């Protein structure tokens, strides 16, 4: 339909946008072809020779050099000639379409007259000429371009002859005789110029035609056709006279029209007179130079004659083909810059203003200017006018419209109607910034806090406080000199130790203002430097690269070489000397005075404060110091020593980036301009990427000759050296080893075949080739999609690739028969017809004479073999891309690709280094991997993977591929036999892939996702997600060590899948309940009662009641209860995969490891009140089976419902690699990853809950839980004497109910039966929902109206405000009668429904059964009613608008209102509904069945308002009991005795040490020994439903348990600092029941989440809000009291003073462990705190100290001792030997002294204890002092140890756990870690040579070291803890072969190994630390 559009038909050669006549590209081509300048490529050179030959034959008598070539003149002669020769009647195309045209205009509200009413005059000539021209072009396109074939076409009397891509023009009169113009110019042009000529002709024809049509419709909107015609005639005349030169003049056409528009529109247009004058004089001068004065005068007259706005604007676009490149002549630019020489230039404001204008007009290419309508008065247009509509809507016309191309000229594509943005300040330049104006608070306030009070926007500030930006710039000098602005704070970026300008918000306002201005102004200049790509999009970059690299040559190849420059310390190197020149120029150009040139002063004179020392930085300290130094006349410090320095000569990261980039660019450009290669540069700060395009000759077979190789290589190195030299001039040094050149195909920005990284520009190319499974469902669609991707890739990488790529893909998919082989012509396919096979496939390749057109097809002797070789070779080349044919899931992202590539490359490398490949194949591969500048290296090295294997994500790429390929391809019903056969072949291909993977050394552990079904019982989760090899994994899964292929493993059915359950009970299988909605509804309907609590069916309300049991009788009682909670440890060990714990009935509690993921998700969800529960669920999800379990989906579903969002959209959940960013096990196994060991028995019961204060009763600060729990616990112990101090166990009252509910809600016991037929995942939710639905009428026994009303009430409450009409129809009750009949029943039904919907909502929010007691439920429900009051008022409001119903409710005691006036006001109504609903809820809950009448006196309105107010304040929350979600007893250590030595007491008696001549006592006491199990262990964590603690540290109980009996004080108060979860205080509370406790939590960056996995919960001081200042941190949304802040210490002291009388005893427990000497600030703070507390009370303090060496221990002890004489040391042996841990008790009454303990004395105390143990060991040589570990603990420890061995590739289970067996196992396992040449059948002789050279990796050696170390411990009882020494040692293998213990050097040595890898050294230390637990089993070794 687009009948004016040439491009649709002229398809082969679309014009590039630059193809206007004057595009430098085409002009240069013409000059090259006609031999005027040196041809750039071989192709043009050949063509040029042929053209010269033709010219010689033609113009025999002339010297060719004398001939003039000027296509512009030719055009100017040709167009008028063609137009005048054309007939005056309009040609056919218009007539054919006229009817359609008029219909179109009719739809716009115009009636178009018939054709004969129009007088087309001149337009007809243009139109007819354009049509004939188009016909000629289309014909010329279709003919084959054969060598030397000449074609001629005739238009009117002109002949066009096409020769060699050039067109000669003959005939006609006006000077076209014999192909000459006047003056000896040849009438000839290139084909591209001819196309451009047609474009011009076509555009003019359209313009005139549209003008004619519009003339009749909207005469005022368009200029007259004759005006346009005469303008065109003038233009032609000018071009004829001046040729190419006249184009410069025509370029000024748009500015000239602009000046006239300025005159017509006046001020509104905002053009300065200066500007108009400049343009006009400049144009006149140019016309004068070109001798076109008269012609130009006529033209300006034409412009001036048009005084109407709209027509004038239409003239704007007449010469748009000239406006494209906007290459202004130098004179023009100089003249315009001359504007700044006016006298006004002294005033900076004027000057800046002029600069703005000039840049605005000439540097922003206003090619879009004609798209913008200046504000036009649309009143003159008719209302139906298309133009008017487009303008008013501000949107573009419909491009699909048939006439769109006509519209393009006249109905300009308006983007939007704008005002010209020429304002009087620079502020249009600025990007606005938020800016804090005032920083006095920083300087004056000692505890500085961020000043959020006065945020102003920068521009607003300038507007209010300064006249203009110019004024600010003018003040730059004084700002620079101002001394008060000298202090700023910066942060140090820890990773790179660079200074980051992030803290520059602390600069004072003015310097910062300059900073922002400078950057913004510099940013504007980036228009002058298109290389700066900070803001460019990927598409822009790709376009730019593509445009630069276009090529049209045949066999000439191009190497795209990218160099990425990296500069040493870029910012620091930006000194004054190397940037000064550029900065001064910028200042001059922009007229900004000192803004840029003095930029370095700010850094040099400023005091830069280390802002990271404290946050926010304490500037007051520095200000005082600065003042002091200034007074002394000292300039400034030069060191960080005082946390400050000055005299910074370089720059600061993040400031002035733009201008420095410019400095760098200018240097780089200088070098590149000398190379004269096509290049483009991208720069961003110091990151400069240079893309060079180097032409090279490629041989016929596609290879590259060695000489070309060398040429490219030397070119590349010379550019490198040039760059280095040039940059050195400006003081910048290149990191040359990182300045890489790279070329070839890349994926994700990494080059696949050479170790160099590829650069920014290509990063996105690979993504094109990853195909999403949603887009391509079947093979054909897939292939179609693939080809488009290949196109995209070929834009970015060199051309050879796409051909290979396609072959690789086809070959790799197993569709082998689809591609037989590849030749330089392309791929040969088996289904091609013979004649096509032999033709050269690459079209457009020009052959030289005598070259064959066909290529002989050699018949292969063995085609199958050849095909296989090709496939093998191509699959090496495309190893990384082998996965492309399979659709991959979108979320696989880079990780899957990277891992897959790593696998493929590993296999390739293996094959290449095996030296087994035939030479032929190696040669093939070499030719494919032929990198022009690759260094001559071992081929295998090229296949080093650019990716590191990522172990932490869910599914391996290969398994995804297999899964998807199987499901998509097998399930398709493929009709095509041939294709089906291919798919079968592909299946076989997959199996091959499996075999390859099966043999590979390191299978990606993410295949675990599939293996996991089988290995559930066997594996420890840690092992699956970390370093297991394929072999180990299979060994574990299949119980036999031989290699099994992965495929058989994946297909093997799981023997016994284990489902992880939340909680369940033992019961007969027959009772299993199938979860189907129908079934649930039937149950509900059959058991429907009239009240909530029916006899037949228990409801959730009933299941909540409980009774308390005395713990002493629990053992007997639990036998009848048959409850077992299957409690899963977060890491099930290999054997005890079910860690069963005996405990109370309801413990849906999950141990988890929390990963950064949760913290991140938390931040993203902050502010969502439902966040907490969802996060708990998410962290649970981390630890359960990820794929096989239905539970996972349930959890995700719950989260999504809780948060109301799609979890996959959370960035943090998508970026899973970040989530598990634990870097292996460097520095010891990450403790949060480990299972349970002595150091963290409690890890798995702690939970990092992110809690925040929400305004509801269900989220309350966890601190309150603990304090409230402790208080209530104390209360219940004192009140219930019968329980003898123990807390009761809580069990359900109605066991049957619970049994039933349990079955219905969470039956997950039997996986095969656990399926919802309707796809319901969340059974509890389904239960609630179906329960609250209305039962079917037919299923109810009988229903009287009262019952129906009750049901409807219930339905109303559950239906969230939907219309109850349906329900009433259902129960045959008329809606009107509802209120009048039984309002009381309606209300009671409503309250019942409300209770249900509330319980349901709690289930959704909290994700597990909601079990509050009724007393707790009531206040929560009241609060809920208050919150949802509007909804209830809508549904029940009508009850209170009728007098009768209101009275009835009043009489029933449900309504508090005696109606005064009815209807009530809205507020009264809401209050009435609220109170009434609350009343009816309490009645329903309390009475269960009956309703008592209530007294008439209701609650007053004020009380309701007050109540609502209270409910909304935090204070109110504290009185509402928190619902008990879980009752918890987390005593993991039942029956585990603390170790105490049975020694004569004097061995450990106190000993006196001499210190500086004085005797000081240092006690070392052991813990008391008691034969009975500690009877009050129930205290570990209470069973009382009043306490909801998330796990108390059982270990701190061990440590503190014997201390209270040693203290002879009766404290009035206990203060706990850093007490974690409050476990440490429990023994003291047992000892003294009376004293209150204050918790305060120490906080430091390092201890947000402590290393052993428990959350440091910060109970503030007793109640919320007492501590001085709470700092909210991003990681933990809880208040933390930082004792290093003086205000907080004061608050603690105040809190203590308020609660005690003077000199009463206070006990302070300090649980801060692990403080090295770097923690001096903290230690000092605690010391200060202790001293200030001592002034007010008699202070006894207990401190936990755990240090790794005695020196630190002593230092800490001395600081804490506060000069006391003595300190008692309680030593806890339940610990590893490599730590010094003790409790230090410092009594209040001992005398003061100045002495300090020496390291020696403390060492002696520890020595004494150690000696004691040795003595004990000697006394009882037959048995070890540690009692036998209880079986459960033993299993846990064994699981830990065996999972460590598993990671080393060895299976250790229970039967191995005797020292002899373990020694045998390790001695024989060692040699098996090595690959021997042949199996060691005769074990006594093996030589060192028989060890394969590559068989021993660093990993293996690490394992050998671990084994040898263990052997030493097992044989000699020496468990060496000096890890640094161990890693240096050598391991030996002796005859047998067997492994020797460490330090044992055998006589016969088969082999010896030593660990080299640094990374492995760290890992090894971690492994050994973990294996140290073996000491628990074999403390004395073999003895």
UniProtKB/Swiss-Prot annotation:
Record-listed E.C. numbers: 2.7.7.48, 3.6.1.-, 2.7.7.88, 2.1.1.375
Q: What is the lineage of its organism?
A: Viruses, Riboviria, Orthornavirae, Negarnaviricota, Haploviricotina
Keyword Transit peptide annotated: no
| Native species | Snakehead rhabdovirus
Pfam families linked: Mononeg_mRNAcap, Mononeg_RNA_pol
Q: What is this protein called?
A: RNA-directed RNA polymerase L
The record's family statement is: Belongs to the rhabdoviridae protein L family.
Gene encoding this chain?
L
What are the alphabetically sorted keywords of the record?
Answer: ATP-binding, Host cytoplasm, Hydrolase, Methyltransferase, mRNA capping, mRNA processing, Multifunctional enzyme, Nucleotide-binding, Nucleotidyltransferase, RNA-directed RNA polymerase, S-adenosyl-L-methionine, Transferase, Viral RNA replication, Virion
Is Nucleotidyltransferase one of the keywords UniProt gives this record?
Answer: yes
């Amino acid at each position: 339909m687009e009948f004016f559009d040439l491009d649709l038909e002229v398809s082969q050669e679309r014009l590039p946008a630059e193809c206007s006549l004057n595009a430098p590209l085409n002009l240069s081509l013409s000059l090259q072809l006609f031999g005027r300048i040196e041809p750039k490529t071989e192709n043009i050179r050949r063509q040029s020779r042929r053209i010269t030959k033709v010219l010689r034959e033609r113009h025999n008598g002339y010297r060719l050099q004398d001939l003039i070539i000027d296509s512009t003149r030719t055009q100017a002669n040709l167009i008028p000639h063609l137009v005048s020769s054309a007939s005056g009647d309009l040609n056919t195309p218009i007539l054919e379409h006229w009817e359609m045209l008029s219909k179109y205009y009719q739809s716009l509200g115009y009636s178009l007259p018939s054709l004969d009413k129009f007088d087309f005059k001149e337009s007809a000539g243009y139109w007819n000429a354009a049509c004939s021209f188009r016909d000629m072009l289309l014909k010329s396109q279709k003919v084959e371009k054969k060598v030397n074939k000449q074609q001629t076409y005739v238009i009117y009397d002109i002949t066009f002859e096409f020769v060699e891509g050039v067109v000669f023009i003959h005939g006609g009169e006006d000077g076209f005789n014999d192909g000459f113009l006047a003056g000896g110019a040849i009438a000839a042009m290139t084909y591209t110029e001819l196309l451009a000529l047609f474009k011009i002709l076509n555009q003019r024809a359209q313009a005139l035609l549209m003008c004619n049509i519009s003339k009749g419709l909207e005469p005022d909107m368009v200029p007259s056709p004759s005006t346009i015609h005469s303008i065109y005639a003038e233009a032609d005349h000018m071009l004829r006279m001046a040729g190419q030169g006249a184009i410069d003049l025509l370029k000024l056409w748009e500015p000239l029209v602009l000046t006239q528009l300025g005159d017509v529109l006046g001020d509104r247009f905002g053009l300065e007179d200066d500007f108009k004058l400049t343009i006009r004089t400049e144009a006149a001068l140019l016309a004068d130079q070109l001798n076109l004065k008269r012609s130009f005068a006529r033209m300006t007259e034409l412009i001036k004659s048009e005084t109407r706005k709209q027509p004038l604007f239409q003239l704007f676009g007449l010469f748009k083909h000239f406006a494209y490149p906007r290459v202004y002549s130098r004179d023009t630019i100089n003249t315009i810059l001359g504007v700044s020489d006016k006298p006004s230039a002294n005033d900076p404001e004027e000057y800046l203003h002029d600069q703005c204008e000039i840049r605005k007009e000439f540097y922003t290419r206003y090619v879009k200017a004609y798209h913008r309508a200046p504000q036009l008065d649309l009143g003159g247009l008719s209302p139906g006018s298309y133009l008017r509509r487009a303008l008013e809507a501000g949107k573009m016309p419909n491009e699909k419209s048939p006439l769109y191309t006509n519209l393009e000229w006249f109905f300009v594509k308006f983007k939007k109607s704008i005002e010209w943005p020429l304002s009087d300040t620079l502020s249009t330049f600025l990007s606005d910034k938020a800016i804090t104006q005032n920083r006095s608070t920083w300087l004056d306030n000692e505890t500085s806090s961020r000043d959020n009070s006065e945020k102003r926007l920068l521009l607003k500030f300038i507007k209010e406080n300064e006249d203009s930006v110019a004024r600010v710039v003018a003040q730059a000098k004084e700002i620079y000199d101002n001394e008060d602005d000298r202090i700023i704070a910066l942060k140090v970026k820890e990773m790179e130790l660079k200074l980051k300008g992030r803290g520059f918000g602390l600069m004072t306002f003015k310097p910062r203002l300059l900073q922002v201005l400078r950057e913004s102004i510099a940013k504007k200049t980036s228009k002058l430097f298109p290389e700066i790509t900070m803001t460019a999009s990927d598409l822009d970059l790709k376009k730019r690269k593509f445009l630069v690299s276009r090529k049209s040559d045949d066999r000439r190849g191009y190497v795209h070489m990218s160099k990425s420059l990296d500069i040493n310390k870029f910012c620091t190197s930006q000194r004054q000397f190397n940037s000064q020149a550029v900065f001064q120029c910028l200042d001059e150009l922009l007229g900004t005075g000192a803004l840029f040139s003095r930029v370095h002063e700010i850094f040099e004179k400023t005091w830069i404060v280390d802002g990271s020392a404290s946050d926010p930085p304490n500037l007051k300290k520095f200000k005082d110091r600065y003042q002091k130094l200034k007074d002394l006349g000292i300039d400034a410090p030069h060191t960080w020593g005082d946390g400050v320095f000055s005299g910074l000569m370089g720059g600061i990261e993040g400031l002035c980036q733009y201008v420095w980039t410019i400095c760098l660019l200018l240097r780089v450009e200088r070098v590149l301009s000398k190379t004269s290669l096509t290049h483009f540069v991208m720069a961003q700060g110091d990151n400069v990427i240079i893309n060079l395009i180097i032409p090279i000759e490629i041989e016929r077979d596609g290879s590259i000759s060695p000489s070309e190789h060398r040429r490219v290589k030397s070119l590349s190195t010379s550019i490198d050296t040039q760059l280095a030299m040039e940059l050195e001039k400006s003081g910048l040094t290149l990191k040359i080893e990182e300045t890489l050149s790279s070329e070839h195909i890349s994926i994700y920005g990494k080059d696949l075949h050479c170790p160099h990284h590829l650069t920014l520009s290509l990063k996105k190319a690979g993504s094109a080739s990853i195909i999403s499974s949603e887009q391509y469902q079947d093979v054909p669609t897939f292939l179609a999609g693939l080809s488009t991707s290949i196109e995209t890739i070929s834009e970015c990488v060199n051309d050879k690739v796409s051909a290979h790529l396609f072959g690789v893909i086809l070959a790799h998919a197993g569709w082998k028969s689809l591609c037989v082989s590849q030749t330089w012509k392309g791929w040969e396919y088996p289904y091609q017809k013979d004649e096509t096979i032999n033709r050269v496939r690459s079209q457009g390749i020009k052959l030289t004479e005598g070259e064959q057109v066909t290529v002989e097809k050699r018949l292969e002797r063995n085609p199958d073999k050849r095909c296989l070789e090709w496939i093998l070779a191509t699959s090496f080349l495309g190893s990384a891309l082998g996965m492309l044919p399979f659709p991959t899931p979108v979320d696989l992202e880079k990780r899957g690709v990277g891992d897959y590539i790593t696998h493929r490359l590993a296999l390739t490398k293996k094959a290449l280094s095996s030296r087994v490949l035939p030479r032929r194949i190696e040669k093939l591969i070499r030719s494919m991997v032929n990198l022009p500048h690759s260094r001559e290296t071992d081929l295998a090295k090229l296949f080093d993977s650019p990716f590191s294997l990522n172990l932490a994500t869910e599914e391996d790429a290969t398994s995804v591929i297999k899964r998807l390929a199987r499901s998509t391809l097998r399930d398709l019903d493929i009709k095509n036999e041939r294709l089906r056969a291919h798919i079968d072949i592909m299946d076989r291909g997959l199996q091959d892939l499996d075999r390859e993977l099966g043999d590979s050394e390191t299978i990606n552990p993410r295949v675990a996702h599939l293996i996991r079904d089988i290995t559930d019982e066997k594996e420890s989760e840690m092992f699956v997600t970390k370093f297991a090899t394929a072999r180990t994994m299979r060994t574990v899964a299949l119980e036999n060590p031989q290699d099994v292929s992965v495929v058989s493993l994946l297909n093997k059915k799981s023997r016994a899948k284990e489902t992880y359950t939340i909680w369940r009970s033992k019961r007969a299988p027959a009772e299993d309940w199938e979860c189907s909605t129908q079934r649930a509804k039937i149950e509900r309907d059959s058991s429907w009662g009239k009240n909530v609590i029916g006899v037949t069916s228990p409801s959730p309300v009933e299941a909540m009641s409980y009774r308390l049991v005395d713990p002493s009788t629990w053992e007997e009682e639990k036998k009848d209860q048959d409850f077992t909670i299957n409690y899963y440890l977060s890491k099930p060990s290999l054997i005890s995969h079910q860690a069963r714990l005996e405990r109370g009935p309801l413990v849906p509690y999950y141990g988890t490891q929390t990963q950064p993921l949760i913290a991140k998700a938390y931040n993203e969800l902050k502010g969502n009140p439902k966040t907490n529960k969802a996060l708990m669920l998410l962290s649970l999800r981390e630890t359960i089976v990820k794929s096989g379990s239905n539970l996972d989906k349930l959890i995700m579903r719950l989260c999504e419902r809780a948060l109301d969002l799609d979890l996959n959209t959370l960035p943090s959940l998508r970026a899973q690699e970040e989530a598990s960013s634990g870097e292996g096990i460097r520095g010891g196994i990450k403790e949060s990853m480990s299972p349970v060991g002595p150091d963290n028995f409690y890890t798995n019961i702690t939970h990092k809950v992110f809690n925040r204060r929400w305004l509801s009763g269900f989220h309350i600060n966890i601190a309150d839980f603990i304090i409230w729990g402790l208080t209530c616990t104390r209360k219940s112990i004192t009140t219930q004497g019968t329980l003898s101090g123990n807390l009761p166990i809580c069990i359900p009252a109605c066991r049957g109910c619970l049994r039933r509910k349990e079955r219905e809600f969470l039956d997950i016991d039997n996986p095969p039966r656990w399926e919802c037929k309707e796809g319901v995942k969340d059974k509890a939710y389904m239960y609630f929902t179906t329960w609250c639905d209305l039962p079917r009428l037919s299923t109810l026994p009988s229903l009287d109206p009262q019952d129906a009303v009750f049901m409807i009430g219930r339905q109303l409450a559950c239906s969230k405000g939907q219309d109850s009409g349906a329900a009433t129809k259902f129960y045959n009750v008329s809606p009107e009668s509802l209120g009048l009949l039984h309002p009381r029943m309606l209300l009671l039904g409503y309250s019942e429904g409300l209770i249900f919907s509330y319980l349901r909502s709690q289930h959704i929010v909290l994700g597990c059964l909601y079990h509050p007691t009724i007393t707790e439920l009531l206040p929560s429900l009241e609060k809920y009613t208050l919150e949802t009051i509007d909804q209830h008022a809508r549904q029940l409001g009508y009850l209170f608008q009728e007098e009768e119903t209101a009275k009835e409710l009043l009489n029933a005691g449900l309504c508090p209102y005696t109606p005064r006036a009815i209807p009530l006001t809205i507020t009264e109504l809401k209050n009435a509904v609220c109170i009434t609903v609350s009343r009816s809820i309490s009645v329903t809950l309390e009475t269960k069945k009956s309703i008592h009448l209530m007294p008439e006196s209701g609650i007053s309105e004020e009380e309701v308002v007050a109540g609502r107010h209270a409910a909304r304040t935090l204070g109110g929350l504290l009185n509402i009991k928190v619902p008990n979600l879980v009752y918890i007893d987390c005593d993991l250590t039942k029956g585990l005795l603390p170790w105490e030595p049975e020694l004569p007491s004097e061995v450990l008696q106190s000993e006196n040490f001499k210190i500086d001549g004085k005797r000081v006592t240092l006690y070392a006491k052991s813990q008391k020994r008691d034969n009975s199990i500690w009877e009050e262990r129930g205290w570990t964590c209470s069973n009382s439903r009043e306490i909801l603690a998330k796990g108390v540290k059982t270990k701190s109980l061990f440590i503190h348990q014997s201390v209270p009996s040693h203290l002879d004080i009766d404290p009035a108060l206990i203060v706990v600092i850093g007490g974690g979860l409050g476990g440490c205080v429990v023994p003291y509370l047992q000892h003294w029941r009376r004293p209150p406790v204050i918790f305060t939590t120490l906080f430091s960056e390092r201890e947000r989440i402590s290393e052993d996995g428990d959350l440091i919960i910060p109970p503030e001081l007793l109640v919320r809000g007492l501590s001085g200042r709470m700092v909210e941190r991003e990681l933990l949304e809880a208040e933390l009291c930082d004792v290093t802040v003086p205000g907080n210490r004061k608050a603690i002291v105040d809190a203590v003073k308020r609660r005690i009388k003077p000199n009463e005893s206070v006990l302070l427990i300090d649980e801060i462990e692990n403080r090295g000497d770097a923690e001096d600030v903290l230690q000092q703070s605690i010391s200060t705190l202790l001293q200030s507390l001592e002034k007010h009370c008699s202070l006894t303090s207990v401190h936990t100290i755990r240090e790794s060496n005695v020196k630190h221990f002593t230092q800490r002890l001395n600081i804490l001792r506060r000069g006391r004489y003595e300190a008692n040391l309680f030593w806890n042996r339940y610990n590893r030997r490599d730590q010094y841990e003790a409790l230090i008790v410092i009594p209040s009454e001992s005398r003061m002294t100045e002495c300090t303990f020496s390291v020696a004395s403390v060492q002696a105390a520890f020595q004494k204890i150690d000696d004691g143990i040795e003595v004990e060991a000697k006394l009882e040589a037959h048995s070890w002092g540690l009692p036998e570990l209880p079986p459960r603990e033993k299993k846990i420890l064994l699981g830990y140890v065996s999972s460590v061995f598993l990671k080393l590739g060895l299976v250790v289970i229970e039967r191995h756990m005797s020292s002899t067996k373990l020694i045998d196992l390790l001695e024989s396992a060692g040699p098996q870690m090595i690959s021997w040449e042949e199996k060691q059948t005769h074990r006594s002789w093996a030589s060192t040579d028989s060890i394969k050279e590559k068989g021993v990796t660093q990993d293996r050696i690490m394992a050998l070291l671990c084994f040898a170390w263990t052997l030493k411990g097992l044989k000699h009882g020496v468990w060496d803890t000096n890890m640094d020494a161990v890693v240096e040692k050598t391991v030996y293998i002796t005859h047998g072969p067997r492994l020797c213990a460490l330090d044992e050097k055998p006589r016969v040595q088969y082999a010896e190994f030593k660990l080299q890898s640094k990374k492995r050294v760290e890992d090894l230390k971690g492994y050994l630390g973990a294996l140290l637990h073996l000491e628990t089993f074999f403390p004395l070794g073999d003895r």
